[in-house]
Amino acid sequence: MNSTDFIVIRNDLQQCKVIETQLPDATALPADALLVKVTRFAFTANNITYAVIGEQLKYWHLFPAPDGYGIIPVWGFGEVLASKHPAVAAGETLFGYFPMATHLVIEAADVSKRGLRDGAAHRQEVSPVYNAYARVSGDPTYAGQQGDFRALLLPLFMLSFLVDDFLAENAFYGARRVILSSASSKTAFGLAHLLHKRGIRVIGLTSKGNVDFVTSLGCYDEVVTYDQVAAIPAAEPTAYVDMAGNSALRETLHRHFGAQMVYSGRVGLTHRASEPDEPTLPGAKPVWFFAPDQIRKRAKEWGPGGIDQRFGAAWTELVPHLPNWLDVVERRGPAAVREAYLDTLQGRVPPDQGLILSLAE
């Protein structure tokens, strides 16, 4: 049988196309393998980040593509069409990291009641979280709109949760306020929601076109457009969480706040405008926030299940807000996926939209 795959040129993300890839049919699957139909997946600016840093973080290794091309990984759902693993049945629903494709063959390993892992050799260079699949058949929190929100936000909100935890653990480095760039992005407003609950002042930076949306979220104490950052009073200690990855903006903020910039953390690349050779800046040295480090630290300190318990509570508290913040927009078929991809790449998707896609017509 064939899988329809959406591929991009790794060093020119504007160039994309759909190809057909031959997969083994149900009878020809190797031992313990699963043939999975990718039913739907979320697509956000975060997936563009996966593509931008695909070489460095080995994301391109997850789903092989023709030379020079890559398949962008996405969070979504799959249905097991056929199984050669004795503990996994056809018809099961899986949630995890899938290719932008209609089908995937998984080499099922470490199968438990709650999940399984893809043991394919080419997938083992990335963090284990990217090879894990949750078995979610019959779980209402993974169905319908709840499932869409999980695909759109759960991985991003985990990053929000970890940054919030890191900043609070370090007493915000003495800052009295936290500034977030790309304030309309899902990771940013998830973090703003958590910070706001802690009572620290949160300032969101955004473009003029997104001011109304960011203000409507209710989790930013102040919303400032990028051309007005110099008007922010510079006299008190400030922490900056950079979701945009924009070198010019980062330099402007550091020079404006000077020694009062007590923390400068780089998290995202929504603007994709970073320069490799950046000047030494006043204030705290910009550092990348590396989520796995915080996960390892807290797993050791909090013990088994400690992270899941705390994150689960934060997610449960967030979910009631999401229908007011996001409209889920479903698009199906190769042409619709291509349009959604290019719109996201060019920043044309309204911030209040969450795209749920399928390559199947």
Feature map (PLM): residue ranges:
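N-terminal Rossmann-fold NAD(P) dinucleotide-binding loop
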Residues: 188-189
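C-terminal hydrophobic helical "lid"/dimerization subdomain
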Residues: 296-361
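NAD(P)H dinucleotide-binding glycine-rich loop of Rossmann-like/cofactor-binding domains
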Residues: 97-176
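Extended repeat-based interaction scaffolds and adjacent low-complexity, acidic/S/T/P-biased segments
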Residues: 163, 194-197
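A short N-terminal beta-strand-loop micro-motif at the entrance of redox/enzyme domains
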Residues: 12-40, 45
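Glycine-rich phosphate-binding loop and adjacent beta-alpha segment
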Residues: 252-317
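Glycine-rich beta-strand-centered segment in the early N-terminal region that forms part
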Residues: 29-41, 55-105, 110
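Adenosine-nucleotide cofactor-binding segment
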Residues: 196-250
